[in-house]
């Protein structure tokens, strides 16, 4: 194994992007970046500073007053404070979903990720616009997908394991609605790039998906 590369994993909701990316990062000893955490950190800052996250310009102005950092242990820092656990709060998650829709904020996050990944190789990242927006120059691009039914079933099982009441039909409807929204959003709609390798995990287990990506990565090192 020689030089490290950067890996981008894209795909629809419920495809297991984050779980797979984290496991691949461990096997390759890469740094895992979750773009969603950056949006959550911005949302948390807006809440803490009393900024109206329903107003794009207010959130954008706030960005000049904050500093976000990541480390190799998947921790995210807001103004020097480790907020990795705090950003998991439901209130923060809801605010982040709103903030992530704003073009100005998305542009800020793109620049943030570009600066990190230009410093060195050995990063793996997931997200619904990673292959074409956040890491367009990644040496390995993966579009991880699966049928809505399989993705909904996996998500329902995950929720059940976490102790949440889950209705499969409700989850399936949510997955299909999210797919439509992601594919038709005005800014950076979800799509498969020409240089991405599609992995359909419908008939694959977790280990098979991870091993496939690790193998593809090693071919490019």
UniProtKB/Swiss-Prot annotation:
It catalyses: CMP + ATP = CDP + ADP; dCMP + ATP = dCDP + ADP. It comes from the Bacteria. It is found in: Cytoplasm. One of its GO terms (biological process) is pyrimidine nucleotide metabolic process. Keywords: ATP-binding, Cytoplasm, Kinase, Nucleotide-binding, Transferase. Its EC number is 2.7.4.25. Transmembrane segments: none annotated. GO terms for molecular function: ATP binding; CMP kinase activity; dCMP kinase activity. ATP binds at residues 11-19. It is an enzyme of class 2 (transferase). One of its GO terms (cellular component) is cytoplasm. Gene3D superfamilies: P-loop containing nucleotide triphosphate hydrolases (3.40.50.300). Belongs to the cytidylate kinase family. Type 1 subfamily. This is Cytidylate kinase. It comes from Mycoplasmopsis agalactiae (strain NCTC 10123 / CIP 59.7 / PG2).
């Amino acid at each position: 194994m020689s030089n490290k590369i950067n890996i981008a994993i894209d795909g629809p909701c419920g495809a297991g992007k984050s779980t797979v990316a984290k496991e691949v990062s461990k096997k390759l000893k890469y740094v895992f970046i979750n773009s969603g955490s950056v949006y959550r950190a911005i949302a948390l800052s807006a809440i803490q500073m009393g900024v109206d996250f329903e107003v794009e310009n207010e959130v954008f102005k706030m960005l000049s007053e904050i500093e976000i950092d990541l480390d190799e242990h998947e921790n995210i820092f807001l103004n020097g404070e480790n907020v990795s656990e705090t950003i998991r709060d439901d209130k923060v998650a809801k605010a982040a979903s709103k903030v992530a829709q704003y073009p100005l904020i998305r542009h800020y996050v793109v620049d943030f990720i570009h600066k990190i990944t230009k410093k060195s190789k050995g990063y793996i990242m997931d997200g619904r616009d990673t292959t074409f927006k956040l890491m367009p120059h990644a040496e390995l691009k993966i579009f991880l997908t699966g049928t809505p039914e399989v993705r909904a079933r996996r998500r329902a099982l995950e929720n059940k394991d976490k102790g949440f009441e889950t209705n499969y039909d409700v989850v399936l409807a949510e997955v299909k609605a999210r797919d439509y929204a992601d594919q038709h959003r005005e800014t950076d709609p979800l799509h498969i790039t020409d240089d991405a390798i599609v992995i359909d995990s419908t008939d694959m287990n977790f280990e098979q998906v991870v091993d496939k990506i690790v193998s593809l990565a090693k071919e490019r090192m």
